Amino acid sequence: MIRICTSLANAGYEVTLVGRKRKTSIPLKTMPFTQKRLFCFFDKGFAFYAEYNTRLFFYLLFQKMNGICAIDLDSILPCYYVSRIKKITRIYDAHELFCEMKEIVTRPRIYRVWKWIERKTVPWFTHGYTVNQPIAAEFERMYGCRYAVIRNISLYDAHQQLPEKERFILYQGAVNEARCFETLIPAMKHVNVPLVICGDGNFMQQAKKITEAAGLQEKVLFKGMLLPAELKLQTQKAYIGITLFEPGARSNYFSLANRFFDYLHAGVPQICVDFPVYRELNNKHEVAVLVNDTSSESIAKALNELLQDRDKWERLSKNCLEAAKTLNWQEEEKKLLNIYKQLFG
């Protein structure tokens, strides 16, 4: 969201980004747009979503605005109602197929609630964008909404000076269900370099328990949430990146994770799940080793082969930096600004 808000602010729009304040929240840095965090007593579950959406509704209700953008389904209800009350333009920024995430689709009662919200609201968000064409096609199929594709890709820096690579494997991003930690962490028993995990999420405690059960506390290192500059440096130092998802949930199958491009811009080859969007990009640019099987054995084999094949690693790393010249935020920003220009002038 920082990239989108910065681009809009630099184009002359007055932008306010609203989120939640948590005990583990990193302090806000000065940005060219306004930032607001809402405090909630509850931190998870139904009580949290009810409280956050209520607080968000009343906050938005008393703000002046010409348009409102809901970021994923968990903030769409207050955005929908406020836009109706104020009679303003509403936009949907869908990072994923929310209802098809494993933590949603495997819980029938929770799934029914979120699907009801989706059916009630999304058809009214006729303007929007998402991260890839398959997800855009799903929204058009389900609700007749024709959303643009804007990928959350890193800014291209032609003058960046990358630090020397260190032989460690990096996972960065949400530590959530269905990211294959159950097989990735045990795989490290058979890989002679450390795994560094940067981020937090609903699977963090389970991931730490898996690490302890496998006796890998010295090899699997949890860094938690890092400041953007710290995470960028950590990524640039990494030798191999990880982009894995469990098969089954359609949200995973149609995903396009931000970290895929973060690794790419840092010249870091990655082990990546062989799903359609990643396959299409890799067929064109060859920046990753794709795996069909996310078992511990398969992950360990892919990691060791890339660790031991210096020529292949160098080829993939070089391809990453070459691909970054065309796969970058400067190109995506043009599409974003065109959408907002059409809506607001």
Residues covered by each model-derived region:
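Nucleotide-sugar donor phosphate/pyrophosphate-binding loop at the beta->alpha transition
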Residues: 47-54, 89, 98-120, 156, ...
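Nucleotide-activated donor-binding/catalytic signature segment of Leloir-type glycosyltransferases, i.e.
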Residues: 208-233, 240
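A short, well-ordered alpha-helix in the C-terminal region of glycosyltransferases
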Residues: 298, 305, 312-326, 338
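Membrane-proximal helix-turn-helix segments that form the acceptor-binding/catalytic region
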Residues: 6, 54-62, 77, 81-85, ...
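Acidic donor-binding loop of glycosyltransferase active sites
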Residues: 235-253, 268
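Conserved donor-binding/catalytic core segment of Leloir-type glycosyltransferases
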Residues: 129, 161-196, 317, 336
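Conserved acidic donor-binding segment of nucleotide-sugar-dependent glycosyltransferases
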Residues: 284-296, 305-310
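Donor nucleotide-sugar binding/catalytic pocket of nucleotide-sugar-dependent glycosyltransferases
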Residues: 16-19, 115-160, 220-223
